[in-house]
């Protein structure tokens, strides 16, 4: 009689984690960092139709790396969660922490029970009335949640990019300084996905960037995208989604 094939739980979880990490590492990195006027999101994304950075609710935004169809489904679910909670209770009851907890449950359940884990990594951020009140949560493929302070990098070479953000970030950055730091950090990864030496960073064309902010000064919907001159010169009036 043929013996049944056995895989230990430890090996099964390790294989799932390795599978998810490889899928995430193939995606282009996303960086999120706080500045004096809010929270900045930036990634290299040549597509004008497929967004990796999106608005979720009034003062909450979402960024992701990995398989687009998987994190897009999570984004839509997050919007529905926020809309339903805001409608059923109060708009102030919709928080990044609550959304992060909901995502963590979904990611953790899929990781342990489904045939394959989701190949995604997420950031959920909420801008507060002051920089100290800003919230940035990073969610991994297995449902683990990290409360980040100031900045975070996701995707291929995330650890090395995080160290570069550590070196360049400080409290009270202006939007121009934050944008310069974000684009320089993203440019530290070559087109082949390998980390470049310090001082040899690529200059990413503005048309290849997807950048958005949660603007603390906006009265209700804080999310807006940065385009054109605002990216080329690191300053200027942003335009786009969320403007009212």
Curated annotation (Swiss-Prot):
The activity regulation comment is: The formation of the proteasomal ATPase ARC-20S proteasome complex, likely via the docking of the C-termini of ARC into the intersubunit pockets in the alpha-rings, may trigger opening of the gate for substrate entry. Interconversion between the open-gate and close-gate conformations leads to a dynamic regulation of the 20S proteasome proteolysis activity.
Q: Where in the cell is it found?
A: Cytoplasm
GO MF entries: threonine-type endopeptidase activity
Keywords of the record, alphabetical order, are:
Cytoplasm, Proteasome
SUPFAM superfamilies on file: N-terminal nucleophile aminohydrolases (Ntn hydrolases) (SSF56235)
Q: In which pathway does it act?
A: Protein degradation; proteasomal Pup-dependent pathway
Sorted alphabetically, the Gene Ontology BP terms of this entry are: modification-dependent protein catabolic process; proteasomal protein catabolic process
Task: Give the main location.
Answer: cytoplasm
Q: Which Pfam families match?
A: Proteasome
- Subunit and interaction comment: The 20S proteasome core is composed of 14 alpha and 14 beta subunits that assemble into four stacked heptameric rings, resulting in a barrel-shaped structure. The two inner rings, each composed of seven catalytic beta subunits, are sandwiched by two outer rings, each composed of seven alpha subunits. The catalytic chamber with the active sites is on the inside of the barrel. Has a gated structure, the ends of the cylinder being occluded by the N-termini of the alpha-subunits. Is capped by the proteasome-associated ATPase, ARC.
Among NCBIfam families, the record links this protein to: 20S_bact_alpha
What family is this? Belongs to the peptidase T1A family.
The name this protein goes by in its record: Proteasome subunit alpha
Organism of this sequence: Xylanimonas cellulosilytica (strain DSM 15894 / JCM 12276 / CECT 5975 / KCTC 9989 / LMG 20990 / NBRC 107835 / XIL07)
């Amino acid at each position: 009689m043929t013996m049944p094939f056995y895989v230990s739980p430890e090996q099964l979880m390790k294989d799932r984690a390795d599978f998810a990490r490889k899928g995430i590492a193939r995606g282009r990195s996303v960086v999120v960092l706080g500045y004096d006027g809010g929270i900045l999101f930036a990634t290299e994304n040549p597509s004008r139709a497929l967004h990796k950075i999106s608005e979720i609710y009034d003062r909450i935004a979402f960024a992701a790396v990995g398989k687009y169809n998987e994190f897009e489904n999570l984004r839509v679910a997050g919007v529905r969660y926020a809309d339903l909670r805001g409608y059923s209770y109060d708009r102030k009851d919709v928080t990044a922490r609550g959304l992060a907890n909901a995502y963590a449950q979904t990611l953790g359940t899929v990781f342990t029970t489904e045939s394959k884990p989701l190949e995604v990594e997420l950031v959920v951020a909420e801008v507060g009335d002051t920089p100290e009140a800003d919230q940035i949560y990073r969610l991994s493929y297995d449902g683990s949640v990290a409360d980040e302070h100031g900045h975070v990098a996701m995707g291929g070479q995330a650890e090395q990019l995080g160290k570069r953000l550590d070196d360049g970030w400080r409290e009270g950055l202006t939007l121009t300084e934050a944008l310069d730091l974000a684009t320089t950090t993203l440019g530290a990864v070559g087109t082949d996905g390998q980390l470049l030496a310090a001082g040899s960073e690529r200059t990413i064309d503005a048309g290849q960037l997807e950048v958005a902010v949660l603007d603390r000064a906006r009265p209700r919907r804080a999310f807006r995208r940065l385009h054109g001159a605002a990216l080329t010169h690191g300053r200027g009036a942003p335009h786009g989604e969320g403007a009212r």
